[in-house]
A protein has these predicted regions:
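Membrane-embedded alpha-helical bundles that constitute the cytochrome b-like, heme-associated redox core
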Residues: 1-176
Protein backbone atom coordinates (compact mmCIF):
# COMPACT_ATOMS: atom_id res chain seq x y z
CA UNK A 1 0.00 0.00 0.00
CA UNK A 2 1.23 3.47 -0.84
CA UNK A 3 2.00 5.83 2.04
CA UNK A 4 1.85 9.55 2.56
CA UNK A 5 5.24 11.21 2.23
CA UNK A 6 7.33 11.69 5.36
CA UNK A 7 6.65 15.44 5.25
CA UNK A 8 2.88 14.87 4.99
CA UNK A 9 3.06 12.43 7.91
CA UNK A 10 5.10 14.85 10.04
CA UNK A 11 2.73 17.75 9.33
CA UNK A 12 -0.29 15.56 10.15
CA UNK A 13 1.07 14.43 13.51
CA UNK A 14 2.45 17.88 14.40
CA UNK A 15 -0.97 19.38 13.69
CA UNK A 16 -2.63 16.72 15.86
CA UNK A 17 -0.16 17.38 18.69
CA UNK A 18 -0.69 21.15 18.44
CA UNK A 19 -4.46 20.63 18.66
CA UNK A 20 -4.00 18.42 21.72
CA UNK A 21 -2.09 21.28 23.36
CA UNK A 22 -4.06 24.33 22.33
CA UNK A 23 -7.44 23.02 23.51
CA UNK A 24 -6.39 22.53 27.15
CA UNK A 25 -4.52 25.85 27.11
CA UNK A 26 -7.76 27.79 26.72
CA UNK A 27 -9.55 25.62 29.29
CA UNK A 28 -6.76 26.35 31.78
CA UNK A 29 -6.88 30.09 30.97
CA UNK A 30 -10.60 30.22 31.70
CA UNK A 31 -9.99 28.95 35.24
CA UNK A 32 -7.75 31.85 36.24
CA UNK A 33 -8.91 35.33 37.17
CA UNK A 34 -7.81 38.20 34.92
CA UNK A 35 -4.08 38.68 35.32
CA UNK A 36 -0.69 37.55 34.02
CA UNK A 37 -1.29 33.80 34.44
CA UNK A 38 -4.50 33.95 32.44
CA UNK A 39 -2.80 36.11 29.80
CA UNK A 40 0.04 33.55 29.53
CA UNK A 41 -2.34 30.65 28.85
CA UNK A 42 -4.36 32.66 26.32
CA UNK A 43 -1.12 33.67 24.59
CA UNK A 44 -0.08 29.99 24.47
CA UNK A 45 -3.49 29.07 22.99
CA UNK A 46 -3.30 31.86 20.41
CA UNK A 47 0.28 31.01 19.46
CA UNK A 48 -0.59 27.34 18.98
CA UNK A 49 -3.62 28.37 16.92
CA UNK A 50 -1.41 30.45 14.64
CA UNK A 51 0.97 27.47 14.42
CA UNK A 52 -1.91 25.18 13.40
CA UNK A 53 -2.96 27.69 10.73
CA UNK A 54 0.60 27.79 9.34
CA UNK A 55 0.90 23.98 9.42
CA UNK A 56 -2.41 23.58 7.58
CA UNK A 57 -1.24 26.01 4.91
CA UNK A 58 1.97 23.96 4.58
CA UNK A 59 -0.06 20.72 4.47
CA UNK A 60 -2.34 22.03 1.75
CA UNK A 61 0.61 23.33 -0.27
CA UNK A 62 2.39 19.99 0.10
CA UNK A 63 -0.80 18.08 -0.73
CA UNK A 64 -1.28 20.18 -3.86
CA UNK A 65 2.18 19.13 -5.04
CA UNK A 66 2.06 15.50 -3.75
CA UNK A 67 -1.15 13.55 -4.21
CA UNK A 68 -2.55 11.49 -1.37
CA UNK A 69 -2.26 7.72 -1.74
CA UNK A 70 -5.37 5.90 -2.87
CA UNK A 71 -7.75 4.21 -0.47
CA UNK A 72 -7.44 0.47 0.20
CA UNK A 73 -9.22 -1.81 -2.25
CA UNK A 74 -12.86 -2.36 -1.39
CA UNK A 75 -13.26 0.86 0.62
CA UNK A 76 -16.35 1.85 -1.36
CA UNK A 77 -17.53 5.11 -2.86
CA UNK A 78 -19.60 6.15 0.16
CA UNK A 79 -16.72 5.64 2.61
CA UNK A 80 -14.30 7.43 0.28
CA UNK A 81 -16.74 10.32 -0.13
CA UNK A 82 -17.24 10.55 3.63
CA UNK A 83 -13.47 10.55 4.17
CA UNK A 84 -12.97 13.31 1.58
CA UNK A 85 -15.78 15.38 3.09
CA UNK A 86 -14.40 14.92 6.61
CA UNK A 87 -10.88 15.87 5.55
CA UNK A 88 -12.12 18.90 3.61
CA UNK A 89 -14.19 20.12 6.55
CA UNK A 90 -11.27 19.55 8.94
CA UNK A 91 -8.98 21.61 6.72
CA UNK A 92 -11.64 24.31 6.44
CA UNK A 93 -12.18 24.55 10.18
CA UNK A 94 -8.45 24.52 10.88
CA UNK A 95 -8.12 27.52 8.57
CA UNK A 96 -11.20 29.41 9.80
CA UNK A 97 -10.69 28.98 13.54
CA UNK A 98 -7.26 30.67 13.74
CA UNK A 99 -8.62 33.55 11.66
CA UNK A 100 -11.60 34.02 13.98
CA UNK A 101 -9.23 33.68 16.94
CA UNK A 102 -7.06 36.43 15.50
CA UNK A 103 -10.14 38.60 14.92
CA UNK A 104 -10.95 38.22 18.63
CA UNK A 105 -7.40 38.56 20.01
CA UNK A 106 -6.26 41.31 17.64
CA UNK A 107 -9.36 43.41 18.18
CA UNK A 108 -7.74 46.51 19.63
CA UNK A 109 -4.30 45.06 20.40
CA UNK A 110 -1.35 43.22 18.88
CA UNK A 111 -1.28 39.42 19.09
CA UNK A 112 1.96 37.96 20.50
CA UNK A 113 3.27 34.85 18.76
CA UNK A 114 5.21 32.87 21.38
CA UNK A 115 6.58 36.20 22.66
CA UNK A 116 8.92 36.19 19.66
CA UNK A 117 7.00 38.59 17.45
CA UNK A 118 3.75 40.50 17.53
CA UNK A 119 1.15 40.20 14.82
CA UNK A 120 -0.39 43.63 14.32
CA UNK A 121 -3.80 44.20 15.78
CA UNK A 122 -6.42 46.56 14.40
CA UNK A 123 -8.78 49.19 15.84
CA UNK A 124 -11.33 47.75 18.26
CA UNK A 125 -14.66 46.78 16.69
CA UNK A 126 -17.15 45.37 19.19
CA UNK A 127 -19.46 43.75 16.62
CA UNK A 128 -16.55 42.04 14.86
CA UNK A 129 -15.29 40.59 18.15
CA UNK A 130 -18.74 39.24 19.03
CA UNK A 131 -19.26 37.71 15.57
CA UNK A 132 -15.76 36.17 15.54
CA UNK A 133 -16.32 34.70 19.01
CA UNK A 134 -19.62 33.15 17.92
CA UNK A 135 -18.10 31.58 14.79
CA UNK A 136 -15.06 30.39 16.79
CA UNK A 137 -17.24 28.64 19.38
CA UNK A 138 -19.50 26.98 16.79
CA UNK A 139 -16.46 25.84 14.83
CA UNK A 140 -14.98 24.43 18.04
CA UNK A 141 -17.89 22.03 18.48
CA UNK A 142 -17.89 21.11 14.79
CA UNK A 143 -14.16 20.40 15.11
CA UNK A 144 -14.75 18.08 18.07
CA UNK A 145 -17.29 16.14 16.02
CA UNK A 146 -15.04 15.92 12.96
CA UNK A 147 -12.06 14.79 15.02
CA UNK A 148 -14.26 12.10 16.60
CA UNK A 149 -15.44 11.03 13.13
CA UNK A 150 -11.86 11.00 11.82
CA UNK A 151 -10.66 8.85 14.73
CA UNK A 152 -13.72 6.57 14.51
CA UNK A 153 -13.07 6.04 10.81
CA UNK A 154 -9.46 5.15 11.56
CA UNK A 155 -10.52 2.71 14.30
CA UNK A 156 -13.02 1.16 11.89
CA UNK A 157 -10.29 0.62 9.29
CA UNK A 158 -7.87 -0.81 11.89
CA UNK A 159 -10.22 -2.97 13.98
CA UNK A 160 -12.98 -3.97 11.55
CA UNK A 161 -11.64 -3.79 8.01
CA UNK A 162 -7.99 -4.47 8.89
CA UNK A 163 -7.02 -2.98 5.56
CA UNK A 164 -3.81 -1.18 6.52
CA UNK A 165 -5.24 2.33 6.11
CA UNK A 166 -3.53 3.68 9.24
CA UNK A 167 -0.12 2.56 7.97
CA UNK A 168 -0.41 5.17 5.19
CA UNK A 169 0.11 7.87 7.83
CA UNK A 170 2.82 6.06 9.81
CA UNK A 171 6.54 5.69 9.05
CA UNK A 172 7.54 2.27 7.65
CA UNK A 173 8.15 -0.31 10.36
CA UNK A 174 11.62 -1.82 10.43
CA UNK A 175 12.01 -5.44 11.51
CA UNK A 176 13.61 -5.90 14.92
Amino acid sequence: MLRYTGIAQALHWLTAAALCLLLPFVWVAENFPPGPVRVFWYMAHESMGISVWLMVLMRLTWRWRHRAPGYPAGTGRVAEGLARLTHGLLYGLLLVMPVTGYLMAGNGQDVPFFRVLNLPGFPHQEALGIAADSVHVWCQFALYGLIALHVAGTVWHVAVRRDGLLERMLPPQRPL
